[in-house]
Amino acid sequence: MTTKAALVALCLPGMAQAVTCRDDIFEDASYSVCEVAPGEDLRLFLNGPDGPYGSFAALVTGLEPTGLTLDFAMNAGMFHEDLAPVGLYIENFQQKARIVTSDGPGNFGLLPNGVFCVGDSFAVIESRAFKAAPPACRYATQSGPMLVIDGALHPSFARESDSYNYRNGVGVAEDGRAIFAISNDAVNFHAFARYFRDIVGVKNALFLDGSVSRLYAPELDRDDIGFPIGPIIGVVTAKD
């Protein structure tokens, strides 16, 4: 089965799940992809009672008293040494960090950057457009650069770039699914963006981070560990 055929098959009636994860290959590089159906309980997490969670294990433990199970999670944007978000961060409608629209150093400042918003639907929105007309986001995280903007690759990406890294990002399909991908091999931005546009098939996609990229996906037996991370995005369900 081809990659695109597999994506279609996952969306056939009667086969829908809250989160569906799979492994994939694109241009000899390995990727893991998790798709979140519209209406699922997708949340952002940063702090627990004792400070930043910093890891999937701490988040799983923190959710236990609430009766919720973590079905999928991924690091969700760049952060400072104290794990605070670099850009806009909204949790349960409360803005915890402001939006940053000026250019600057590093990947975050490589404009255009963008915001992933969880509201009545999922959306990836360029940061300045978001600031000009902010939607109602229950959760939102800003990162950068944008990978795909209205079907076009970020103008700064070069196919021949020798900047290779592990990377993760998110895009939104036309049917409303949020599609998260992480590279299991080092890839450059051009390849990563083309994977989202040409294989995943989204018109807008946002880079979340690189090198610290992590995935929690029990379906794939993934529970990545490493240095502490800042914002975490994940799907939760009530325990049976």
Region annotations inferred by a language model:
Residues 29-33, 112-113, 164-169, 229-230:
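Short glycine-rich loop/turn motifs
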Residues 1-9:
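Sec-dependent signal peptide recognition
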Residues 86-102, 156, 160-166, 172-204, ...:
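Conserved, well-ordered active-site substructure
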Residues 84-157:
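Active-site-adjacent helix-turn-beta-strand microarchitecture at beta-sheet edges
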Residues 17-107:
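Zymogen propeptides
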Residues 36-39, 117-122, 149-150, 172-176, ...:
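Short acidic-glycine loop/turn motifs at beta-strand connectors
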Residues 9-18:
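Hydrophobic h-region of N-terminal signal peptides that target proteins for export
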